[in-house]
Design a protein with these regions (language model features):
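Alpha-helical membrane segments in multi-pass integral membrane proteins
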Residues: 116-131, 139-164, 186-190
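C-terminal transmembrane-bundle signature of multipass membrane proteins
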Residues: 152-221
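Cytosolic juxtamembrane helix at the C-terminal end of the final transmembrane segment
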Residues: 3-11, 63-77, 126-144, 191-215
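Transmembrane alpha-helical segments of multi-pass membrane proteins
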Residues: 75-91, 144-157
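Alpha-helical transmembrane segments of polytopic membrane proteins
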Residues: 45-57, 110-123, 176-188
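Juxtamembrane "helix-exit" motif on the non-cytosolic side of transmembrane helices
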Residues: 30-40, 93-105, 160-172
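Alpha-helical transmembrane segments
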Residues: 14-29, 86
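Membrane-proximal helix-loop-helix units in multi-pass membrane proteins
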Residues: 89-140
Length: 221
């Protein structure tokens, strides 16, 4: 009974986090795009930069709360989700530290390096999870693995564009900013779909467990 109550609280918490995550994606995407187009010179946008950065932590929380819904080895999954969560936390810290990406400096290089490493960790962990998911699920559920990988690839591309910006800024600012904006929007859309899939799978799993538990109780009675 206690375990069931804990699961119910966990699902309620997940529902709240998913809603907040969607709001952050909705509000944070235009902030992220505008902040890049204004070269980080707008003070209001700089203050609001924490909103898109918070999305990383929310996604980590969603991944962590969803981990039990996946039909894989518990130890294997725990390691994958631990890596994913760590990567998003590192990304969050990197993003909230004020960094002028328009200048080539030691701080910029360190920020880009850390951002890149955390992106690779998240990318590898997601592939490991996705492979297990694709093996297990059939039909439309195959999409989940592809969506997760596509989302991370696009997100890493955003980071790369940000990284090469100081180098090519003088050559073709417009193209770099356009590519970054497009990647940000696409990445947001893909992450929104990922969150939706994760949320749906968790709800379906919990409903199935509840249904099985009810049937077993009925049979016992």
């Amino acid at each position: 009974m206690k375990n069931q109550h804990k699961k119910s609280n966990q699902l309620s918490l997940l529902n709240i986090i998913v809603i907040v995550c969607y709001l952050c994606l909705l509000v944070g995407t235009p902030i992220s795009v505008l902040n890049f187009w204004t070269n980080g010179e707008n003070e209001v946008l700089n203050q609001l930069w924490v909103i898109p950065a918070c999305t990383q932590l929310l996604l980590a929380a969603i991944w962590w709360l969803s981990r039990e819904a996946f039909p894989t080895s518990a130890t294997y999954l725990r390691r994958c989700f631990a890596c994913m969560t760590l990567a998003y936390v590192i990304t969050f810290i990197t993003r909230i530290v004020p960094t002028d990406y328009t200048e080539v400096s030691v701080q910029t290089m360190i920020a880009i390096t850390i951002y890149g490493i955390s992106g690779i960790i998240a990318f590898v962990a997601s592939i490991m999870i996705s492979v297990r998911l694709i093996r297990h699920y059939t039909g439309s559920k195959h999409t989940l693995g592809i969506v997760i990988i596509a989302g991370l690839v696009t997100n890493i591309l955003c980071s790369l564009v940000q990284g090469i910006y100081p180098i090519v800024a003088e050559a073709d600012v417009q193209t770099v900013k356009t590519v970054h904006s497009a990647c940000t929007v696409i990445s947001t859309a893909i992450f929104a779909v990922t969150v939706s899939y994760l949320h749906t799978i968790v709800k379906e799993t919990e409903a199935a467990k509840l249904s099985t538990g009810t049937e077993e109780t009925g049979e016992t009675a």
